[in-house]
Amino acid sequence: MNVAGLIVGLGNPGKEYERTRHNLGFMAVDALMEAAARETGGGCDQLSGGKKKYDLWRCRITPTGDPWLVAKPQTFMNLSGEAVLAIASYYRIKPDAILVVHDELDIPLGRMKFKTGGGNAGHNGLKSITQLLGTPDFHRLRLGIGRSPHGGETTNWVLGRLSGPEQTLLDTLLPAAVQAMTIFASQGAAAATQFANAYKPD
């Protein structure tokens, strides 16, 4: 099966983690798949559901060209690399054709940044993927969650749910994140970087 690459949304499985800050990656790829169903006519076909390590879809993200794989690891965040490595190995996808979508403490909520390679900024999902792929040279779409205005323990913040005003910002960010992923799929990393890094909420 020919595929253009792999887009991975990071998060934690289970209802207790739904709509938490750490699950922005899951929310973003869900929005991407909804957009694919609306706009390309092809939508997404589920290839693997309920597997131990991941849920996987084949999606027609752009009207032309090969479809993309879209994945949501089911391993919990700290073991995300196990899912990414399993998919990349089976489908023979190289790191430069992988985009990981994740939450980012160092970017304010409502903003996003696209980058290729680099460090993990303390993100355990990225750390796991880097270790198991053996390289940091994959693409990342970093969705801002900001840091707690009250300080305190980071774990409680990232696993907390969004407030009403935060949800409003997220509702604006997700369509823009979908656009960034679509630009990456159709035009490449440079164009996606230009769009994502210039994006500001209204």
From Swiss-Prot:
PROSITE patterns referenced in this protein's UniProt entry, alphabetically: PEPT_TRNA_HYDROL_1, PEPT_TRNA_HYDROL_2
An annotated GO cellular component: cytoplasm
Subcellular location: Cytoplasm
Gene Ontology molecular-function annotations: peptidyl-tRNA hydrolase activity; tRNA binding
Residues the record marks as site: Discriminates between blocked and unblocked aminoacyl-tRNA: N12
UniProt xrefs under SUPFAM superfamilies: Peptidyl-tRNA hydrolase-like
Coiled coil: none
Catalytic activity: an N-acyl-L-alpha-aminoacyl-tRNA + H2O = an N-acyl-L-amino acid + a tRNA + H(+)
EC class of the enzyme, as a word: hydrolase
Protein keywords: Cytoplasm, Hydrolase, RNA-binding, tRNA-binding
Catalytic residue list: H22
Chief subcellular location: cytoplasm
Highest taxon of source: Bacteria
Binding site for tRNA: Y17, F76, N78, N124
One of the protein's GO biological processes: rescue of stalled ribosome
EC number: 3.1.1.29
InterPro entries reported for this sequence: Pept_tRNA_hydro, Pept_tRNA_hydro_CS, Pept_tRNA_hydro_sf
Site, Stabilizes the basic form of H active site to accept a proton: residue positions: D103
Biological role: Hydrolyzes ribosome-free peptidyl-tRNAs (with 1 or more amino acids incorporated), which drop off the ribosome during protein synthesis, or as a result of ribosome stalling. Catalyzes the release of premature peptidyl moieties from peptidyl-tRNA molecules trapped in stalled 50S ribosomal subunits, and thus maintains levels of free tRNAs and 50S ribosomes.
Protein family: Belongs to the PTH family.
HAMAP family documented for this protein: Pept_tRNA_hydro_bact
Subunit structure: Monomer.
Name of the molecule in the record: Peptidyl-tRNA hydrolase
Biological source species: Nitratidesulfovibrio vulgaris (strain DSM 19637 / Miyazaki F)
Organism phylogeny: Bacteria, Pseudomonadati, Thermodesulfobacteriota, Desulfovibrionia, Desulfovibrionales
Gene that produces this protein: pth
